[in-house]
């Protein structure tokens, strides 16, 4: 069994749409040091959400830069709200070496997002759903 830790993403809803650089780095360091295998982080509303009216303390690119030292210690990725999908967000995730994007949709709507999942996989990124 593998456990995904989404504290850095979903937990950020408690403080707004994301954690500060200091807290993000502190938690990435702690989670990887304690061998959490899969870590989801970034804007609580998902990659690209800052451009859709959901600003976080950091931009997606700033979160991605912050994660670079930890990419070889765990599968690190971000949430992608399927309704806010934009191809450039998948490109950005691939450019920064994310291991996965977790594509979220409303219950029963998964069939509407096969193109988004295909795009994620075509960029060499795991697509969690």
Regions found by a protein language model. Name each.
Residues 78-82, 99-110, 128-129:
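Catalytic beta/alpha-barrel core
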Residues 1-6, 28-47:
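N-terminal glycine-rich anion-binding loops that anchor highly charged ligand groups
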Residues 17-26, 105-112:
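Glycine-rich anion/phosphate-binding loops
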Residues 49-78, 117-129:
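Alpha-helix-loop-beta-strand connector modules within alpha/beta enzyme cores
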Residues 1-16, 68-73, 126-128:
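N-terminal small/glycine-rich loop or linker at the start of catalytic domains
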Residues 20-30, 83-93:
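Short, acidic/polar
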Residues 11, 31, 101:
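Conserved, mostly hydrophobic/aromatic
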Residues 37-63, 102-111:
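Glycine-rich, proline-tolerant flexible connector loops at the mouths of alpha/beta enzymes
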């Amino acid at each position: 069994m593998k456990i995904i830790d989404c504290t850095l993403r979903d937990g950020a809803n408690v403080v707004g749409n994301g954690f500060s650089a200091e807290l993000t780095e502190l938690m990435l360091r702690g989670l990887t040091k304690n061998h959490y295998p899969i870590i989801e982080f970034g804007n609580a509303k998902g990659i690209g959400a800052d451009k859709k009216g959901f600003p976080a303390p950091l931009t997606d690119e700033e979160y991605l830069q912050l994660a670079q030292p930890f990419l070889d210690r765990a599968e690190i990725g971000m949430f992608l709200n399927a309704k806010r999908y934009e191809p450039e967000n998948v490109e950005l995730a691939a450019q920064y070496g994310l291991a996965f994007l977790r594509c979220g949709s409303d219950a029963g709507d998964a069939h509407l997002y096969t193109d988004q999942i295909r795009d994620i996989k075509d960029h060499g990124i795991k697509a969690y759903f």
